[in-house]
């Protein structure tokens, strides 16, 4: 089977979370014998500047540098047709040409799926989350409200155009089936490439931590809950406990309304998310609201790091082995204290977490539902009417 995968970003080994998931998926598809062609857009303002990182050299990835539209045009597109920037670039013609040789086309994320109407092959849109579950929809005169409304409009437009939709959790699939009743919705676990996460975390240090992008609403609400409620309870039982916080924008100044607490170290942006996670003995992620599988949780599993989180934090995970999942802040704190205090318990939980990764989120098992979806799509023989 010939599959064209369209990415709106370069799948870099040390790129963002979406890049690492894309690599895991591509390795799984290749392992199942799929004849892959990968077309990745690299939107940039400076056309002389290459991607900041390395592409996997053993995967058939065609990187397409495209100039970012002018800021005035981008602002207009955000109003007129959100998430459609790639439609105003030469990437459009590349997608059309490469799709001619494919049995199935797989668009990753909304910003790529904006091109779904341009191909005449069975095509699937992959989405990781739903805006209404991730953030409050504020008034349009606020920046947060405008962003949320733009995302909702993009979702509505692209879901309407998609006959097949791919998600990573039942919690996203069920509401999506109501939003897009005409579409076939498939759930497949998110995979990661285990080679990126070797060696595993030693778990020697009794240190808790969390990594994420500070401005992303689910991360922001987890940090607020962590520092207002969970970490103070940990300190009551273990005054010498340490908490490491890292990620883009993860600076003390970004959260001026939160208390200063002992043992908290703000790392900010780190060179390698994987290396940061290897420092931890526990991933502590008290997420209150957020949809889809969380990459930081998957990465902790792949590294064999025990996880203490909520049901939303564990969404899309194939098994709870190696995780403590609870909604109560006191219970989350108790579980964290127990793991910090007992090296053997950390090792046992870490081994169980790694087994969960291998059984459910390694490339081959995680992509089995995707292979089945491709076969179903190809068997229909349906060709979409394309835009002129």
Task: Locate predicted features.
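A charged, aromatic-enriched C-terminal amphipathic alpha-helix characteristic of glycosyltransferases
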Residues: 17, 344-374
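Conserved catalytic-core segment of nucleotide-activated headgroup transferases in glycan assembly
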Residues: 21, 191-196, 202-260, 265-279
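Membrane-proximal helix-turn-helix segments that form the acceptor-binding/catalytic region
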Residues: 92-97, 131, 145-165
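Acidic donor-binding loop of glycosyltransferase active sites
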Residues: 103, 163, 278-292, 303-306
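Active-site proximal beta-strand in glycosyltransferases
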Residues: 118-136
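Carbohydrate-associated surface elements
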Residues: 171, 188-191
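Short hydrophobic beta-strand element within catalytic cores of glycosyltransferases
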Residues: 296-302, 306-310
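Conserved acidic donor-binding segment of nucleotide-sugar-dependent glycosyltransferases
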Residues: 322-330, 338-344
């Amino acid at each position: 089977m010939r599959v064209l995968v369209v990415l709106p970003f370069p799948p870099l080994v040390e790129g963002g979370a979406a890049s690492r998931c894309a690599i895991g998926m591509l390795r799984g598809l290749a392992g199942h014998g799929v004849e892959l062609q990968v077309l990745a857009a690299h939107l940039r303002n400076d056309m002389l500047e290459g991607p900041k990182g390395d592409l996997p050299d053993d995967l058939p990835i065609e990187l397409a540098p495209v100039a970012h539209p002018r800021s005035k045009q981008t602002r207009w597109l955000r109003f007129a047709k959100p998430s459609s920037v790639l439609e105003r670039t030469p990437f459009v013609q590349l997608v059309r040409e490469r799709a001619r040789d494919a049995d199935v086309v797989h668009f990753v994320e909304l910003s790529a799926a904006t091109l779904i109407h341009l191909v005449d092959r069975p095509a699937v849109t992959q989405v990781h989350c739903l805006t209404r579950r991730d953030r409050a929809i504020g008034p349009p005169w606020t920046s947060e409200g405008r962003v949320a409304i733009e995302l909702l409009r993009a979702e509505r437009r692209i879901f309407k155009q998609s006959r097949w939709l791919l998600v990573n959790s039942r919690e996203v699939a069920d509401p999506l089936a109501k939003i897009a009743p005409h579409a076939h919705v498939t759930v497949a676990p998110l995979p990661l490439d285990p080679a990126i996460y070797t060696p595993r975390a030693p778990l020697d240090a009794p240190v808790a931590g969390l990594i994420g992008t500070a401005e992303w609403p689910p991360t922001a609400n987890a940090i607020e809950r962590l520092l207002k409620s969970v970490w103070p309870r940990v300190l009551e039982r273990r005054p010498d406990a340490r908490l490491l916080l890292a990620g883009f924008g993860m600076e003390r100044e970004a959260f001026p309304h939160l208390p200063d607490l002992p043992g908290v170290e703000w790392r900010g942006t780190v060179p390698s998310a994987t290396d940061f996670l290897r420092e931890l003995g526990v991933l502590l992620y008290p997420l209150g609201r957020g949809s889809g599988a969380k990459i930081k949780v998957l990465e902790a599993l792949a590294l064999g790091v025990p996880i203490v989180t909520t049901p939303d934090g564990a969404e899309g995970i194939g098994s709870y082995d190696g995780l403590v999942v609870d909604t109560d802040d006191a219970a989350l704190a108790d579980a964290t204290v127990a793991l910090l205090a007992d090296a053997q318990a950390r090792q046992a939980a870490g081994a169980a977490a790694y087994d969960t990764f291998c059984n459910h989120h390694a490339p081959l098992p995680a992509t089995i539902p995707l292979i089945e979806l491709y076969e179903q799509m190809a068997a229909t023989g349906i060709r979409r009417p394309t835009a002129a």
